[in-house]
Amino acid sequence: MGIQGLLPLLKSIMVPIHIKELEGCIVAVDTYSWLHKGALSCSRELCKGLPTKRHIQYCMHRVNLLRHHGVKPIMVFDGGPLPMKLEQENKRARSRKENLARALEHEANGNSSAAYECYSKAVDISPSIAHELIQVLRQENVDYVVAPYEADAQMAFLAITKQVDAIITEDSDLIPFGCLRIIFKMDKFGHGVEFQASKLPKNKDLSLSGFSSQMLLEMCILSGCDYLQSLPGMGLKRAHALITKFKSYDRVIKHLKYSTVSVPPLYEESFKRALLTFKHQRVYDPNAEDIIHLCDISDNLGEDSDFVGPSMPQDIAKGIALGQLDPFTQLPFQAESVTPKLAVDDISRPKSFKPETVKKKLDLPVQKNLLTKYFCFASVEAKRKFKAPRISPMSLTPTDESPSIPDDNTPDLDALSSQTTNESPVYSLGENPCVSEVAEKRDSPDDDAVERNHKDLHHKYCEREVDRPKSDSLKVIVRSKYFKQKQEDKSLKQSIPCLNDCSVIGQRKAVKTVINMSSASKREESHRAIATSPCLHHDRIYNDHEDAKEASFSAMNEVAERTINTHKINHQINEEEQNPSVEIPSAFSTPENVIPLSSIAIDSCHGVATGKRKLDSDENLHKENLKSKHMRMDETDTALNAETPLETDDVEKFGSNISHIGHYSEIAEKSVERFVSAISSFKYSGTGSRASGLRAPLKDIRNTCPSKGLSLKPDISKFGYASSNRHMVTKSRRM
């Protein structure tokens, strides 16, 4: 604690100093002040009893700094409890206990900054913590001494007896103890401020000229110290004024008793004991290896002198001074810990480099409130029950790439299938329905060749899908209600049974080759690199669609003859299943075209094959403007579809046809007409009321209020002042 506010008042005589100026000197160090500073970095560990050595490293760094500059340190430790300081120690113990409870509460709530502050106030440097540092000092051959009671009195004894040249401390109690040279506020670089008792008369803020050491001591006790609490409203400046005026403490107390200040009845007796404690406290003499008084014993000490420190046997005093006995229990310490040895190794050796990747993940607690108490516990429980998902190979949906049987005569099939893969908007993780169907058809020996071919294709495709990175397959795509219907159509596609006839596959190739040949011939004739303005793009797109229609019609006519064989295969499929309509998104199909299911080539393992015509560089310019068309199939029997001609479907999907844009003008016109008809009911009529509910102004009634411009101006002359001697003035003028 020290003397509150003493060092700031002595700032004018404090001189900056570096410890290299003390080269060749012996200094006594208040070790507990360094331990308290070092404990700030590990206060939580010390309060919880966790192993740490940061406080020891803090002290040893400064010890090595002193020795580096040629200064010999003597480390002085506090000893047992002093009876005069018992009340103050109990008060500090209660404060530490309260701060520890607050620190645990703040830590539980996740408030780390408040918890750190409370831990710093709750940490207590016990004799066991000091004993760890003593073991390191022994290994480093650094001198130390443990005071029987107070380290301040022990350092004052060493300074008065000239065993040390200066004292390094943070406690201002050393000034009233009578120390001549003190170093305050020493940092890790060796900088500090020096106090010299010879400069006290030159102090500016608090004039101490004419003050003796006794008067200075009485002033400090009167303002409040560790041994006696100050009176209400008594500080350093008021104590200085009273001591300056009355010269001694007994006169000051007598003056205070007759003034408005309330003085306790035992205050004067306590003041005497505090004064004797500063002068005659028991300390350890290293030369005599025995316990003695700080100053010579006076006769007024009395028989009860235990308040300056109870007497103890010489062997116990020596054991405490050497750090072998606990100053509180006066018993030997327990087995030595290995922590101090590790601390010495860390001080003398550089720290080994640890990569950042080895560091453990730090889970910071979240501040608790009504919401976090619910969600945080839920998240912890979820973490405990979490199980990593099993990695399974991805399979295809009808929108993915469909493997085709290689054929030299049909090179366009691979190109078309690759185009459909690149333009496919969705990649799903569903299971392949064709795998189970192939397994069910193993009993038929006629389909073994086709079955083996399909197995190889499916195996190659699965290997290709497994090699695909996970990030590509885990794309989340938000779809509108229109695409919801499209997904239902895709699910219907997956339910279509696979056809295992080679003739169907060959027929599909023939259809695609015919379509490709017709579309290629049309492209050579129509699509040429002609520079056109943007306004002509619409006409050109229309022509492209007309060409595509003709190509599709011709292709369907050529395929019509080959569909008869397909009907037989289709009748083998379960008749109870309904034939869903299958969409074939291609550039040459139109919404009016409806083709039978049998005429569509179906892959044996991956559902409906998707055909698209190639786009050359000229067509890529208009790709964004093209309207995507879909061929739809009527939900009727496949045999009927083979015989029925192409039909038109007037109902079009919203996303696949944007022709409704042309009706916007009609919609807008109708909406305006409805708005006008609705608002016309509020039209103002001369006889009726307004829509606002206010009455219309009356045109027949004239305003009878006179205008402001026609108002008569008041005659100001009647308010003028007329003097009583007016007639006398006129007469004088006449004369």
UniProtKB/Swiss-Prot annotation:
Mg(2+) 1 binds at D30, D78, E150, D152. Its EC number is 3.1.-.-. It is an enzyme of class 3 (hydrolase). Residues 438-456 have a biased composition (Basic and acidic residues). Binds 2 magnesium ions per subunit. They probably participate in the reaction catalyzed by the enzyme. May bind an additional third magnesium ion after substrate binding. Residues 138-230 are annotated as: I-domain. One of its GO terms (molecular function) is metal ion binding. Residues 416-425 have a biased composition (Polar residues). Gene3D superfamilies: 5' to 3' exonuclease, C-terminal subdomain, 5'-nuclease. One of its GO terms (cellular component) is nucleus. Residues 1-99 are annotated as: N-domain. Mg(2+) 2 binds at D171, D173, D226. Residues 391-456 are annotated as: Disordered. Putative 5'->3' double-stranded DNA exonuclease which may also contain a cryptic 3'->5' double-stranded DNA exonuclease activity. May be involved in DNA mismatch repair (MMR). Belongs to the XPG/RAD2 endonuclease family. EXO1 subfamily. This is Exonuclease 1. It comes from Arabidopsis thaliana. The gene is EXO1.
